[in-house]
Each structure stands twice: as structure tokens, then as C-alpha cells.
């Protein structure tokens, strides 16, 4: 059974696409495919855990939310939590583990926001802090200063996980954010946060509140209609190295952008010249779905060959075991377990440890 949160969020998505289609006819194909996209993610035959995830979201308590801060590193939902509500909420959110992208805070005052370092989820009076595996706020801090102004723009976030960065894009003033990711778990994690955010991200008009601005479609990029050209900005962060055909991925991203639109590409790289590309023999940092790790120079060449212009690298950062780590909300192995215990500059397989670059380009 679906609760009002999921039903309403999906209705808002439909109406947003309907309004968009009246301006951009290519969006009609999205509307045609939408019922299949949304039904498939709830099909127990495809996703055995889908009914349990839906039930967890459905049982989340309705809180009186006083404020929502989409611009803070810890995405904060200010609300009063009774002890019983806190216990119920914590238990239900933990049924949606592992939480990989965040962090999020539910309860408490924004003025007294917790940090991940000061969390105490054992305190029955404290807000709930979802300390995710990734410090996704750190990535946003690296990326955000280099972005074009998102205010009023249509944004696509490819491989957006549970939606943390999508919420931050909305907080930066984007007119519409559509997050896509084929994970059933991530979809329901997003819906759990949407339950508490409510209409806080909606357009506001003199006559009242309008459409939600942040939406989620549980599909991969290749499921979208090609050459939609609907978005002013497209993000692909942490996706390219999982693609068997990186050039196909770049062309698919390009097809979603309007002419002159901005691509934000963040991916694993290695050091080297324009001819340097690592193709892991088997696993990379214990991941068996990593195919290509280019140098920054090679990646710039790929983007230019794919037809992008004004390509620039704005950030290169080593992924630390402080940025990606095991937590109360993600209790499985994490980065520290994937590095050589005697040399943290290498993975267990002997490859260079994760190094991430962010590039920005224009269509």
C-alpha cells in the first residue's frame, strides 16, 4: 500500500511534466513513459524489498514542521519530535538502511543544528541525524562554487542516489530538479525525506503554493527519451566510471541539455597525460563495475570529442576515509576496507586510491 507521500509526490511529478510539455513538446514522451517507470519500481517481482520499503515510508509519523533548510550542509527539517515519534521515526528510517548519501537531520532547531561529529542518537531528546556513508556535503562544497547560477533553471541529476544533491540544487534556486537513479532503495529513501520536507521546496506565488520543485524518477539515464533537450544543467556525479561505454554516456547527457546548457561531470580519474586511461582487470576498490578511469587530460579530450565546448577541470580531490566511511546508518564495508592496509595510496588490488575530478562543460 502506498501512502499519501509517494502518491502526492508522483502526482506533482506528473503535473510538472505536463506543464513542461506545454512549453517543450519533447516532454510528452516522458509523460507517456512515466506510468511504466513508476509502476516498475514498486513491482515485487522486480524488487523483492519494494513492499517493505513502501510500508516503512507509509508508517512515518506526520510531524509539525516549522522550517526546512535546503542550503545547509546537514539538510535540516526543523520539527518538534515527541519521544515516541522519535523512536518510531528512527526505527522506520533504519529499515531503509544503508543510507549512503547525505547527511540529513530531522527534528530540533535549525539554529542548534548538529554536526556529524557531535551527533548522539542515543539521546531521546536529540534530533535524528542520519549520518550517511558519504559526506555528500563535502562534494557539494567542492562543486557549488564553480556552477553557473542555478536560479530558475531546469536541472537533471543523473545517478542522484537518495537525493541529497538534488535537494541542494533546489536550495540553490533551481526551478525544477529531476533526480534519476534506478535504485529501489534510494527511491524510497528520497520519499522518506520528502515526507518530512513536504511542500517546503514548492514554488511560492502571491496566491499560494505551487508545484514541488524536486522530483525523482527511478530509472537509469538510458531509459530517458533521447535528445529531449529539456535541461539547462545536467549533473553526472559518480556515474561515468560505472559505464561500459563512456562516450555513449556523454552523448546521452548531451542529449538532455538545451543548446548552451551546462554539464557538471564528476568521476574517478588517475594521474597521467592525455593518453592515460586505467581499465581495471577485475575489481577496483572491490567494485566489479568500474570500467574506465581516465586522466583529467584524457577526460577533457573525451568531452571535446563528444562535442562539448569550454571544458574545464575545476576540482581534483583524493577521497579520504573521513569523507567515505562506515557509520551507524551504513554498517557495511566502506573505503577503509578497500585500501591497502599497508599503503593507503593504493587500493587492495594495487591500483591508485580513489581520486575524483569535477569538470564543467557547455553544449
From Swiss-Prot:
EC number: 2.5.1.-
Any one Gene Ontology BP term: tRNA wobble uridine modification
Protein origin, superkingdom: Bacteria
Family affiliation: Belongs to the class I-like SAM-binding methyltransferase superfamily. CmoB family.
NCBIfam families noted in UniProt: PRK15068.1, tRNA 5-methoxyuridine(34)/uridine 5-oxyacetic acid(34) synthase CmoB
Self-association state and partner proteins as the record states: Homotetramer.
Single annotated GO MF: transferase activity, transferring alkyl or aryl (other than methyl) groups
Listed Gene3D superfamilies: Vaccinia Virus protein VP39
Signal peptide: none
Species name: Psychrobacter cryohalolentis (strain ATCC BAA-1226 / DSM 17306 / VKM B-2378 / K5)
Listed SUPFAM superfamilies: S-adenosyl-L-methionine-dependent methyltransferases
Chemical reaction(s) catalysed: carboxy-S-adenosyl-L-methionine + 5-hydroxyuridine(34) in tRNA = 5-carboxymethoxyuridine(34) in tRNA + S-adenosyl-L-homocysteine + H(+)
This protein's UniProt keywords: Transferase, tRNA processing
Keyword Transferase part of the UniProt annotation: yes
Function (record text): Catalyzes carboxymethyl transfer from carboxy-S-adenosyl-L-methionine (Cx-SAM) to 5-hydroxyuridine (ho5U) to form 5-carboxymethoxyuridine (cmo5U) at position 34 in tRNAs.
InterPro entries for this protein: CmoB, Mo5U34_MeTrfas-like, SAM-dependent_MTases_sf
Xref: HAMAP family: tRNA_carboxymethyltr_CmoB
One Pfam family from the record: Methyltransf_9
Record-given protein name: tRNA U34 carboxymethyltransferase
Residues reported to bind carboxy-S-adenosyl-L-methionine: 101, 134, 139, 159, 181-183, 221-222, 237, 241, 356
Gene: cmoB
